[in-house]
Amino acid sequence: MSAARADRLVELLAERELDSLLVTNLLNVRYLTGFTGTNGACIVSRDERLFFTDFRYVEQARDQVPDFERIQAGADMLRDVAKRLRGRAGFDDDHLSVASFTKVSETVPDGVELVPAGGLVEGLRAVKDDGEVAAMAAAAELSTGAYDSLRERGLAGRTEREVAVGLVRFMEDAGAEGPSFPPVVASGAHGALPHAVPRDVEIPRDTLVVIDMGAMVDGYCSDCTRTLATGSPPDDALELYELVRRAQQEALPAATAGAECRAVDRVARDIIDAAGHEEHFGHGLGHGVGLHVHEAPRLGKTAEGTLEAGNAVTVEPGVYLPGSVGVRIEDLVIVTGGEPRILTGFPKELVTVG
C-alpha cells in the first residue's frame, strides 16, 4: 500500500518538475510509510524511498516500513535528512517551521533548490481507499454506539464533563484507540459556542444539548454531531432544530462527485439565511476527515475545488444564538458518483433522552 502511494506521489512530483519531496509532518509520513511513531521523516523521489527515524523506533520501523530504505538518524535527524536531498527538492511548507527550514537550507548539498510544495500529500490523502473507508466506518459505528448509550443513561442531572468522560470511556471500551478529538457536550445557551468545552455544570431538563464526538480506529477518525433534547424544550428551540435538520437534509445529496465545494455549502446556507439566521451560521458546512479530524477538502463559502469520489467529508450546518441556544447536526459521508454514503447512523429526528 505504501509503495503505491509513493508511486502516485512521484507522478505529482513530475507534474511539478520536482526531483524529490521532503516529508516531515507525521501524519503525512504515516500515510506514505505506515509508520506510527512520534519521530520520523521521509524523502520520496523517482529513484529512492528513504525513511529516517531515531534509535527508539528502529525495530518498530522494521515491521511498519517495509517499502522504504530505513535509515537510523543521529541526534539531529533533520540535518541527516537534509544531506540526502537532491536537485529541485520540495518540502511541505505548510508544516515545516522557520527554524527547521533554516536548518535544512543550511545543510543541503550544493546545488539543491528547496521549493515550497505543501499540500501534495494532503491531496492524496483526501481520496480514501477501501481500507481507509473501512476504518472510518468502524470508528463511526463506535460513536453511534456511544450516542445510543445516552438513551439508557440520560443527560439531565449529569454534568457536561461527566457525560463527555463517559462517552470517551464507552468508545474506548468498545475498541476505539481513543477519541478523535475531545468531545463537545454543551447544554442550553452553552450550545451556542460551536466548540464549547464541557463544564462541571449539571444539564437541566427541557433544553437542547449539542454533542460532537468521534472515535479513532487504526489511526482514522470519525466525526459526528447530534443535538439531543432533555424533556420538552421550548417551541422556538424546536423550530430552530427543524431548520437545521432541513438544511442538512437538503445539503447531503448535493455532496456528490464533481460538485463545487462552495456550491454544496450554499445549499444549506441559503436555507438558513432565508430563515433570518445568516449571522448565526458562521462556519463552513464541512471538512475532510481521515488521519486527522480536519483535513482536505473543505466545504465553505470561499472553498476552492470540487468533490471527488472517495472524499470523506462532514456535512454539518449549525445555528448558534448567543445567550440562548445552539443546534448542529453533522454526518460523516463518503462521496460517490451519486448519493453519498453516510457513515454516521444515529437518528436525526430529534431524540429525547431525558
Regions found by a protein language model. Give the residues of each.
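Active-site neighborhoods and metal-handling regions in enzymes and metal-associated proteins
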Residues: 1-354
